[in-house]
Design a protein with these regions (language model features):
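Conserved active-site and cofactor/substrate-binding residues in soluble primary-metabolism enzymes
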Residues: 46, 50, 104, 153, ...
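Flavin (FAD/FMN) cofactor-binding core of flavoprotein oxidoreductases
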Residues: 18-27, 120-124, 134, 202-246
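Dinucleotide-binding Rossmann-like beta1-alpha1 core, especially the glycine-rich loop
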Residues: 1-28, 34, 155-156, 165, ...
Length: 246
């Protein structure tokens, strides 16, 4: 699988991509252990909040009448001449063109706009831990495992954030609320939507053991740590603390 990822990276001309020896791995990440590794020096992350704020600034610079409306629920769409009217709980907005980036509500918004969909959004939550200050020296870059191609997840990994914090995770567990970021969050409509969809049960039954293990890890710091130790064996229970969910 590592070799396949390497070939794909080369085909896509990923800058600086190379296969490295275990000695090179030890130089780059002294606390990381593995049987093989790829080094991608051009990889990085961004602060999504800052990036979004800059996009708003640019949009308003290009079109002075541009506005951002927060905290509004889209109730419906309507056609008005050649344009579309977005109806919210606080007003109506008309546009010549409408682009819907609905996130976890994308399927519901599409249906409101008359799109016939068989698919449904099924929510999954990812929990993270963070490294405590005394352990941050154990991770110097971004460290990822070789992903399992059977699942649309990257696997538990280490991310050095723009603010200097280091996130570890996530897991992947079914959530009973689409925007439920707490372990016990629940929404009846979201739950019935998900459990009333045959695709949800197909996913459950074909990945039962994986799902059970993910849930166990969601409620056990020690089990989460064991997964992290596959990449950084020297981590201890005192090195990590609960972080955000997403």
């Amino acid at each position: 699988r590592l070799e396949k990822i390497y070939r794909i990276g080369k085909k896509n001309e990923v800058e600086g991509l190379e296969k490295i020896s275990l000695d090179q791995l030890a130089e780059i990440e002294p606390h990381c252990k593995g049987v093989g590794a790829l080094w991608v020096p051009c990889t990085g992350i961004i602060d999504f909040r800052s990036a979004t704020e800059k996009m708003v600034e640019v949009a308003q610079g290009v079109q002075g009448k541009s506005n951002v409306h927060l905290g509004e629920e889209v109730l419906d769409f309507a056609t008005d001449g050649d344009g579309t009217v977005v109806i919210t709980n606080k007003g109506k907005y008309k546009a010549d063109k409408l682009i819907v980036c609905g996130g976890l509500q994308a399927d519901r918004l599409a249906r409101k706009d008359g799109v016939k969909l068989r698919e449904r959004v099924v929510g999954f939550r990812g929990d993270y831990y963070e490294l405590n200050d005394h352990a941050k020296h154990k991770v110097k870059n971004l460290i990822y495992p070789v992903p399992n191609p059977d699942f649309p997840f990257l696997g538990v990994h280490f991310t050095r954030m723009t603010n200097g914090e280091i996130e570890c995770g996530p897991n992947a567990v079914f959530t009973f609320k689409r925007e439920g970021y707490g372990k016990t969050d629940f929404n009846l409509r979201d739950t019935l939507d998900a459990l009333g969809y045959s695709g949800t049960w197909k996913l459950f039954f074909s990945n039962m053991s994986f799902g059970i293990n993910e849930y166990r890890r969601a409620f056990s710091k020690r089990l989460f740590l064991k997964t992290l130790q596959r990449l950084v064996p020297s981590l201890t229970i005192d090195d990590i603390r609960p972080g955000r969910s997403g």
